[in-house]
């Protein structure tokens, strides 16, 4: 018979039975995943897995379903385990609130490093800068608003703008024969050849047509003869200019009134004298 001291305790009997019968407890998935040893695929020797150093957080460990089931199955101290889990959950939930409260209270509790003297100096320098900037802007605006000294050509341009607000539009000078034709047409049919119609036809202002019809001046015979001579000379001079370019043929009777003859003839007469 066995001695009473060598008899196994009633708590060790279930463990011995399990070892003899080969029964294995169902470990949770977290224990399998983060176990300290992992079986090698080639041999039966166990080697440390690289995932063994990845420690579980308290929340993940406590919320795993297998662990909760295992804890519910154990009859020893069920009230203490549930109370500890609830306390851990409450502590984790209160942590972010404490952090947020600390972060919100920090800026309020911080004391400004600037003393009363430094604050006064800062405000004084700021006001001085503001006044200096305003003074600089005012001086620039005064310089821009001040009248600049105009050059002669600018003064002349302003005077021409005042004299001719619509721009340079010189009066059109009509030929004396055209003036006679305007008078003749208006005398024949005043209703048809009105002042606006004649102004549009000859491209002059109605005021100019009105003055032409109003005037009664007629040139004398001497003025008419002088005018014809002047027109003939002009005609010959223009003909000679076009002949030199090659547009018109040369004419010997117009050679005396050419520009070259007039220029060199005046020089020869001056040298002979």
From Swiss-Prot:
Q: Name one GO cellular component term.
A: mitochondrion
Q: Which Pfam families match?
A: Neugrin
Q: Which InterPro entries does the record match to this protein?
A: NGRN/Rrg9
Q: What are the record keywords, sorted?
A: Mitochondrion, Transit peptide
Report the family membership.
Belongs to the RRG9 family.
PANTHER family the UniProt entry points to: NEUGRIN (PTHR13475:SF3)
Q: Name it.
A: Required for respiratory growth protein 9, mitochondrial
What is the species listed in this Swiss-Prot or TrEMBL entry?
A: Paracoccidioides brasiliensis (strain Pb03)
